[in-house]
Amino acid sequence: MTGLLFFLGAAASAVCDDPQTQTDMTICAGKDYAAADEELNAQWAITAKHMKEYDNTLDRSHDTRPGYFETLLKAQRAWLSYRDAHCTSAGYYARGGSLEPLLVSSCKAELTRERTAQLRELAETN
């Protein structure tokens, strides 16, 4: 059974090197988004840790505003809502058709990679 699963995974990976059908393209777009999301989650952990550490270095005894991490978390939650709504809207170009999931996944992958770069830059410049 394990050998079959490995074979199927390898076959799916090979398909994404040169997808030929709409189904293949949709599957590959989903995998691309999943990979981008994994990268985002890894970068989020790095950036969040950095911002928490930065917050701890500040004297906020006279400052009641939220800290760096708290505002970043709020922004990230808003960004996730934006990304999902925006990409759902982008998919409506082919609403109900077989192209819709490909458009949504491709949009999510693109925006997720852009956000990952933003988070990386935040961690590197602060």
What are these regions (language model features)?
Residues 1-9:
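Bacterial N-terminal signal peptides
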Residues 11-126:
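N-terminal alpha-helical modules
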